[in-house]
């Protein structure tokens, strides 16, 4: 498994709405993530700084990257763009984080 972590932002007035939209996520989005090899996906909120910290284990970078081109992912990004900063393609503005420590 490949461990990934990344950070995103959420609008200051949208914390509750962001959480509501993820509980639960769309069943078809969950199915796409799982079918593309995503496991143990978690998102944490830093309320003071409006930051979202996400971790996920993936089976391959290629399969993970392919999620972005699915119809359901494109619809999800469009659905979420009003609660968080988004790129021109509606994907969330994000930055990948470098792992510096891991205890198994």
Swiss-Prot record:
The pathway that the record names for this protein is: Carbohydrate metabolism; L-rhamnose metabolism
Domain of life according to the entry? Bacteria
Active site located where? 22
Q: Which residues bind substrate?
A: 18, 41, 76-77
The GO terms this record gives for MF are: L-rhamnose mutarotase activity; racemase and epimerase activity, acting on carbohydrates and derivatives
Q: Which UniProt keywords apply?
A: Carbohydrate metabolism, Cytoplasm, Isomerase, Rhamnose metabolism
**Which cellular component appears as one GO term in the record?**
cytoplasm
EC number of this enzyme: 5.1.3.32
**What are the annotated disulfide bridges?**
none
One Pfam family hit: rhaM
A single BP term in Gene Ontology: rhamnose catabolic process
Where does the record place it? Answer: Cytoplasm
| Record-linked Gene3D superfamilies | 3.30.70.100
Q: Which reaction does it catalyse?
A: alpha-L-rhamnose = beta-L-rhamnose
User: Which PANTHER family does this one have?
Assistant: L-RHAMNOSE MUTAROTASE
What quaternary arrangement does the UniProt entry report? Homodimer.
Role played: Involved in the anomeric conversion of L-rhamnose.
Its family remark reads: Belongs to the rhamnose mutarotase family.
Please report the name of this protein according to its UniProt entry. Answer: L-rhamnose mutarotase
Whose protein is this, by species?
A: Salmonella typhimurium (strain LT2 / SGSC1412 / ATCC 700720)
Taxonomy of origin reads: Bacteria, Pseudomonadati, Pseudomonadota, Gammaproteobacteria, Enterobacterales
């Amino acid at each position: 498994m490949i461990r990934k972590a990344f950070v995103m932002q959420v609008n200051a007035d949208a914390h509750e709405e962001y959480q509501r939209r993820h509980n639960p996520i769309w069943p078809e989005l969950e199915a796409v993530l799982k079918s593309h090899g995503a496991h143990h996906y978690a998102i944490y909120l830093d309320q003071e700084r409006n930051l979202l910290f996400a971790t996920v284990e993936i089976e391959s970078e290629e399969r993970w990257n392919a999620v972005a081109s699915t119809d359901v992912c494109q619809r999800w990004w469009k659905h979420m763009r009003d609660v968080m900063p988004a790129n021109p393609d509606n994907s969330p503005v994000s930055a990948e984080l470098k792992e510096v420590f891991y205890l198994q």
